[in-house]
């Protein structure tokens, strides 16, 4: 997957000058994060880490990832509506994973009371890597699907201009023209706006559940600004604020500070550390309301690793997408090997295989946010500890994807420009809206490319490992 940046990466003086220009353009374009020293304040900000050059992505795999996104939207939506499947699939996990168990408890309470919301909104991001086959070709393999707080749609809208600028400075105008336009924040806002419209109350607002210490606020503001341009007002609140000032009326309409809420958009609530007892009570209040939750609790559960693993079993996709063999084939083509670790012969065999060949597998807990997976010797030690315990059911085992590395230059605040061997992860943003049983929107709305040094096994931009990038189609 050669791109022709090779000679450019060898001229240290030119790289330093290009890096200065690229950083200034990134700041001008709004590729920004708050600092780790002051994550609650925008008084001092920095550029978000990014690559100096766009990275090579096979055009066919980019097209394949876009083509399958509507299928993944349908699949997640179908899973979220199947309470029996969710209960059966997560039954072993919730015995040992307290976070998934708490989410599932809320799911059961809402089902028992009766789901009040009639409009459903999914904003997700399906993430892939490019498996390098023995013959040198590359294959698209899904890492995971993020159904809650799928981030960087805002900043990904602003990075193409930076890479076009870098290539233009070098006189590479043809190459600059190959960088795809990309505006996920506009598409994500379109989904929220559609859900708001279907809710049917012109004065209702969108409630964005956020953390107080939020370095990635500019990513979120991009979506807020798109909504405001449509005259849809967004209020940012923490779970604690919902506990103190949120309420439901007799029709289970949600009010915040006396203002009716049409859509609740979660940019918090996807990790155990995000919840105190008070926050769990706030989440239940939100779920009980007729406001459109993005995601509702069932959709968050549909995005767990255990559900991902069960969907890879023979016949399961067909049960969710009956009469759609082409969609099933598109989905299955992206699946890597996924293995249950539930107690029993199947789980025992998976553990034996992984301990025998640790370089071929990844051990994944039911966690979002990056930096949670175990590899190599660390994975072997965990499996040896877990193999006779019920706790192993809170993990899944996944075939390790081995992409072909390439060289790029990574730019991080406070660090020198660094040319290094890298690998990339491609995310495709999907949006769907359903009213009752009728799907009224189902589309892909843009992409995100993140790149990291091959020495880092796990973790994304927010975890401080990967940097923002753009695909250079090859």
UniProtKB/Swiss-Prot annotation:
It comes from the Eukaryota. It is an enzyme of class 6 (ligase). Substrate binds at residues 125, 148-151, 214-216, 220, 267-270, 450, 461-462. Pfam families: GSH_synth_ATP, GSH_synthase. GO terms for cellular component: cytosol. It catalyses: gamma-L-glutamyl-L-cysteine + glycine + ATP = glutathione + ADP + phosphate + H(+); gamma-L-glutamyl-(2S)-2-aminobutanoate + glycine + ATP = ophthalmate + ADP + phosphate + H(+). The modification Phosphoserine is found at residue 415. Pathway: Sulfur metabolism; glutathione biosynthesis; glutathione from L-cysteine and L-glutamate: step 2/2. Its cofactor is Mg(2+). Keywords: Acetylation, ATP-binding, Glutathione biosynthesis, Ligase, Magnesium, Metal-binding, Nucleotide-binding, Phosphoprotein. Catalyzes the production of glutathione from gamma-glutamylcysteine and glycine in an ATP-dependent manner. Glutathione (gamma-glutamylcysteinylglycine, GSH) is the most abundant intracellular thiol in living aerobic cells and is required for numerous processes including the protection of cells against oxidative damage, amino acid transport, the detoxification of foreign compounds, the maintenance of protein sulfhydryl groups in a reduced state and acts as a cofactor for a number of enzymes. Participates in ophthalmate biosynthesis in hepatocytes. Homodimer. This is Glutathione synthetase. It comes from Bos taurus (Bovine). The gene is GSS.
